[in-house]
Amino acid sequence: MVTICVIPARYGSTRFPGKPLAFLKNKPIIQHVYERAKSSKMIDEVFVATDDSRILHTVESFGGKAIMTSSKHPSGTDRIAEAVDKLLQEGYNLQESSIVINLQGDEPLIKKEMIDQLIDLMKNENDSIGTLAKRIEKEDDFFNPNIVKVVFDKNGYALYFSRSPIPFDREKFIKGFSKNNFMYKHIGIYGYNVRILKNFVGLPMSRLEEIESLEQLRALENGIKIKVGLTEYDSFGIDTPEDLEVAEKCLNTYS
């Protein structure tokens, strides 16, 4: 069964315009992400789905493959779906059951072990989306709206994702930072088969998705399950120019 990775990368980020092309340790961010995806032996091919010719040309300049997509997509998953449609139109060998890995274009610290873990998880999830999470250990991370939190049921299926601190341990937070075992950070990587991907993008943007600016809430609001795999590894999404300095310090640690 074919497994591909598609990296959505748009130029016009509100907080960091041109982010995929910003340099991190002598390489554009998008090249770091692409190389991380290529390091997984479980992925057959990697593509960047972009809305900007500058990103496309940059990807091609380092030997990568890029697909031009519309600038009007409300989420990265919608952009990926257009890229997959184009691949299908060109006769690429994708089936309804083929796995598509969505690796966010601003996650240059993702490890191949995380990608491989998600692919393994997806082999048993024909009707669900897959993703990863890691336990939160720092109070600042729990209250940081740029770090998405997730809570899940006893079977590992997501109940909710939020930029707010969830679950909020009322009694313990009155006295100080709670050290409970239910605080998890969402890692910016998804997996789905082609059928679920098509189903997802056929749904209208949901109210919770708009409020939280989290595309995965569209799935939950429409009854699509999201299986959460727990990882011991961390990652770091770049949201602002200031994050580049932090990422540079972390890069050697996470390599």
UniProtKB/Swiss-Prot annotation:
It is found in: Cytoplasm. It catalyses: 3-deoxy-alpha-D-manno-oct-2-ulosonate + CTP = CMP-3-deoxy-beta-D-manno-octulosonate + diphosphate. The gene is kdsB. Its EC number is 2.7.7.38. GO terms for cellular component: cytosol. Belongs to the KdsB family. Keywords: Cytoplasm, Lipopolysaccharide biosynthesis, Nucleotidyltransferase, Transferase. Activates KDO (a required 8-carbon sugar) for incorporation into bacterial lipopolysaccharide in Gram-negative bacteria. Signal peptide: none annotated. Pathway: Nucleotide-sugar biosynthesis; CMP-3-deoxy-D-manno-octulosonate biosynthesis; CMP-3-deoxy-D-manno-octulosonate from 3-deoxy-D-manno-octulosonate and CTP: step 1/1; Bacterial outer membrane biogenesis; lipopolysaccharide biosynthesis. SUPFAM superfamilies: Nucleotide-diphospho-sugar transferases. Transmembrane segments: none annotated. InterPro entries: Cytidylyl_trans, KdsB, Nucleotide-diphossugar_trans. It holds the Pfam family CTP_transf_3. Gene3D superfamilies: Spore Coat Polysaccharide Biosynthesis Protein SpsA, Chain A. This is 3-deoxy-manno-octulosonate cytidylyltransferase.
